[in-house]
Amino acid sequence: MMARRDPTSWAKRLVRAQTLQKQRRAPVGPRAPPPDEEDPRLKCKNCGAFGHTARSTRCPMKCWKAALVPATLGKKEGKENLKPWKPRVEANPGPLNKDKGEKEERPRQQDPQRKALLHMFSGKPPEKPLPNGKGSTEPSDYLRVASGPMPVHTTSKRPRVDPVLADGSATEMSGRGSVLASLSPLRKASLSSSSSLGPKERQTGAAADIPQPAVRHQGREPLLVVKPTHSSPEGGCREVPQAASKTHGLLQAARPQAQDKRPAVTSQPCPPAATHSLGLGSNLSFGPGAKRPAQAPIQACLNFPKKPRLGPFQIPESAIQGGELGALENLQPPPAATELGPSTSPQMGRRTSAQVPSVERQPPHSRPCLPTAQACTMSHHSAASHDGAQPLRVLFRRLENGRWSSSLLAAPSFHSPEKPGAFLAQSPHVSEKSEAPCVRVPPSVLYEDLQVSSSSEDSDSDLE
């Protein structure tokens, strides 16, 4: 019975079994087209063409023989912009053009406001907009533009001085500069100081001519050297009623008595030009503390010197005691009459009572006295008609009770040089030691007793 089977039936069964296995292995989904068929949904990754895949034999990247030059499918006129774009007419602007026009008009309206603000802050006239962008050359255009007031330019130059006045004041400035340049700070401060005297006192002063050379002295404090210009004396001496200084009065009374024993010290007519050379317009006097000193009718100077500043060794006007003589109250031509110590002996007033009334001392105030005792020895040469003059010395000593004693020393004559002590016994004006009340000064200022006396040898050598 086995031999009787048909072999064809066995072959059909085998084919069916193989097809079933293929169907089980095949993925679920649409069946891929055969490679020869073209599917426009596919795109080749190698060449980027549509209709085949990268595994297809139609891809030119795998089969260069089958590669063909791509041919254009047809000419399309709508894609290329062969004709240029024509601008639209301004009469019918589009919506975009309307927005642009509004934005341009806004800054144009803000321009006048900006120009007005700039005109307010800068002061410049605003620029007038020209019509049609053309400049007008009409002569009346400037009247239409608002403009501010013109600025006034002032010059800081000083007015010129008349050459005649400049030449006349040059001599005064030269004399004044030679004197003020040689003054020490204490001496400059003493020019502005004043002390009070009784209202009933009347003093007259005589000024002596001042020659150019000066005398040095030996001392621990800086010396006062004055080199004023020499001026020719004019006329007689001026008398100052109740305005002359106390220093002038005492020295004038002392000089006539000293002429017998000291012929060198002589009175000379006061030169008015010397007052100008020293830069003072009037004689200063010792007036009451609350009143201003009276002024004598002497020629006033054109330019007064500036008030000197107070240094460590200088004092204001209120620092001088009322009943004592201050340091350098009146800067007059005779240097011997320029400075005296803080006090003058009462004996000098008694001896000169025949010519000058006695000095009435007022009770001392609670003001501090001079912080330092300055060297007051001044020497001068007389006129050419005299042989020579001697310096006037004032000796200051500090006592134990805090007071000061002053003594007036007269230098010996030029021909018979002697020691100051020996001449002290001969001179009738030698004042005894007198005590003047004074407020205590700190020891840092008065570090030692200042004793001012120059030897006759030094003064004689300087005079020669």
Swiss-Prot record:
Biased amino acid composition, Basic and acidic residues: 74-89, 97-114
Species of provenance: Homo sapiens
Pfam families reported for this sequence: zf-CCHC_6
InterPro entries given in the database record: FAM90 (IPR039213), Znf-CCHC_6 (IPR041670)
Annotated protein name in UniProt: Protein FAM90A11
Compositionally skewed regions (Low complexity) per UniProt: 180-197
Other noteworthy facts: Primate-specific FAM90A gene family, thought to have arisen during multiple duplication and rearrangement events.
Start-end of Polar residues biased regions: 341-356
Annotated region (Disordered), positions in chain: 1-42, 70-389, 415-437
Highest taxon above the source species: Eukaryota
Family of the protein in this entry: Belongs to the FAM90 family.
